Amino acid sequence: MEFTSQALSRLSNTRRLPGLDLGDGFLLPDYQGGSILNLPSSFCHWLELPGLGAAPLRDELLAPFQDVQRVILVLVDALALHRLQRWMADGCAPVWHTLAEGGLLAPLTSIVPSTTSAALTSLWTGRSPAEHGIAGYELWLKEYGMVANMILHAPISFRNDSGSLSKAGFKPEAYLSMPTLGVHLAAHGVHSYALQHHSIIKSGLSQMFFQGVDVRGFNSYADLWINLRHLVEKRPGERQYIWVYTGEVDHFGHFYGPDDERTAAEFAHFSASFEQLFLNRLSPEARRGTLLVLTADHGQVATTPDLKYNLRSHPELAARLH
């Protein structure tokens, strides 16, 4: 993994903001070819299409992959690089170690801010949050007079009211004022598919991205990987971009902690089912021309519980928030 070590060293020595000391552990986003922001144009490059948004990845990341007919992006929410490396090495998810030996393990930075709503929008537009406008999990929407949750598309003060911004005239499919990847690919003869859990395929955030995309829900990992294999096998001559998203590692990380054994076990389950139900059963014909990309929207940092950070410990502050 010499390439991985060299790439990490370069990212650690990336340019700093003058006069702003962020500490040694802080990495600035590498928008010049080393970030998830550069993935959409990279997909276009591999499929021999004009790019979308930011430039593609650096040449050393693009060049190894030629004659690509199909790109499958597997996005595991919150899968940090150092945890992936640990889980590859400790027997939790050895399939990715095997694939990396025959491919490339390339460190990429996320975007700023590195939150799901902002990162997924960048992956579907090729634009940074400063350009596409989804600058965080919660946003002040001046035209609607409220702070909104940009995943649920509801006022942050409301509970169990997902999508309620539509009652105020908010149209998620019309919110972004720039082309999205599905529309761009369709214009150049590439069919786009999105496989996500049934519970989120019609979420407001998903509706923002999925114009021109064939969206398919799944209920379990068995459902996901068998459906994906059938999709690939039954359309051998079709040029494809396939988006696979799973949020379980992120959910477990928030609930139990990113380094908890249950979080690792969830990724192990995800990876084993991928290997057994998709990879090992994929025909040689379907493998030919298929590029598989595993990535994440962001990582997670484990924090120690501390009562001073609990709002209940500050009743006077809490009283001023209502």
Where are these regions (language model features)?
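Feature captures the catalytic ectodomains and active-site-proximal regions of enzymes
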Residues: M1-H322
